């Protein structure tokens, strides 16, 4: 997927980090055969369930941002110091090696979709997300557009940064799964 040329530098940088994180995620994901992809360790998710979880989270995030901004960006609240601190805290939490339960707002992954199905769906989602982000006027980057279950409301810059940290958080999980099934 090409990097974006139309976003301002700050959002473009965060988007590119998210794109790069997905490439790193795919490096780990491609180490799984089709059978291994669905093999579920006794103590956790399969690689398929991790992908389904991340895809569900990103799908929900984009859907929330679209709905929240559908009445216009001017009516949205601006980012406060509290929003900044809470965003930093959730990203620090995701950067830690600790395991956390997925928020209850997300469905439990089913382990039934193929790798190719999910990658295709993820590619379509990322294209849609890129289009959405490109259409945001940079004067609205400080508007609160997404409610993250732990951090609360985030602006678009914080949301893309959160998705980046969320995706990176699951890369070691793929490595653990691979070591448990090999």
What are the residue ranges of the model-derived segments?
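Short, contiguous alpha-helical
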Residues: 37-90, 127, 134-182
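Alpha-helical interaction segments
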Residues: 5, 27, 35, 111-112, ...
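Short alpha-helical hairpin
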Residues: 1, 26-35, 96-104, 139-146
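An N-terminal domain-cap segment
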Residues: 6-44
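Hydrophobic packing residues in well-ordered alpha-helices of helical domains and bundles
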Residues: 11, 18, 47, 118-122, ...
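Amphipathic alpha-helical packing segments from all-alpha helical-bundle domains
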Residues: 27, 121-132
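Class I S-adenosyl-L-methionine
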Residues: 19, 26, 130, 175-178
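Short, helix-capping/interhelical loops that line the mouth of catalytic, cofactor-
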Residues: 1-13, 60-120, 182
